[in-house]
Regions:
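N-terminal loops that bind phosphate or other acidic moieties
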Residues: 1-161
Length: 161
């Protein structure tokens, strides 16, 4: 029940986007020496960030990338592109700098954190943060993938990270 209260408290603190800051961000972009829309999705992200922070000029000095790893029980139905062993292998590879994401993180000086939220196979890799909700979800074709309590706990864990 504590997780449920934490989630409800966090939801109650979410405020509407600052549309004034978003308009100001769009105006600023229109004044920059570049073709309109030439930065693509980055322009949309900067407008949304202005709406969230209430400021047109934002900096993100250092980032941390979280990779939350878990297995899905519906793999039993043969609908997955890869076996569950790939979840574990990729999780370990991420901690060793052997994936595209980990190489990019290293290049830009960002921290990459791998979190076990439900890896099914056993492993020994101290670099993986254990926040497991169980050994993967259940097969949602046959039963609910997880309980409400598990889902809420997962969301609250993500918020804490």
């Amino acid at each position: 029940m504590e997780s449920e209260q934490t989630l409800l408290s966090a939801i109650s603190q979410i405020t509407a986007l600052d549309t004034g800051a978003m308009d100001a961000a769009r105006k600023r972009q229109a004044e920059l020496a570049k073709p309109p829309g030439s930065l693509g999705l980055l322009e949309d992200i900067s407008v949304q960030l202005a709406g969230i922070t209430g400021s047109v000029k934002n900096t993100i000095p250092k980032t941390r990338i979280y990779v939350l790893a878990a297995d899905n029980g519906v793999v039993d139905e043969g609908v997955s592109s890869a076996p569950q062993s790939v979840t574990l292998a990729q999780s370990i590879n991420l901690t060793r700098g052997l994936t595209g994401a980990s190489c990019l993180a290293k290049h830009f000086g960002d921290e990459l954190v791998v979190v076990d939220m439900g890896i099914r196979l056993p492993y020994h890799c101290p670099e993986i943060v254990n926040r497991s909700l169980g050994k993967g979800t259940k097969n949602f074709y046959k039963e609910p993938a997880m309980t409400r309590a598990q889902a809420v706990s997962g969301i609250v864990c993500g918020m804490a990270l």
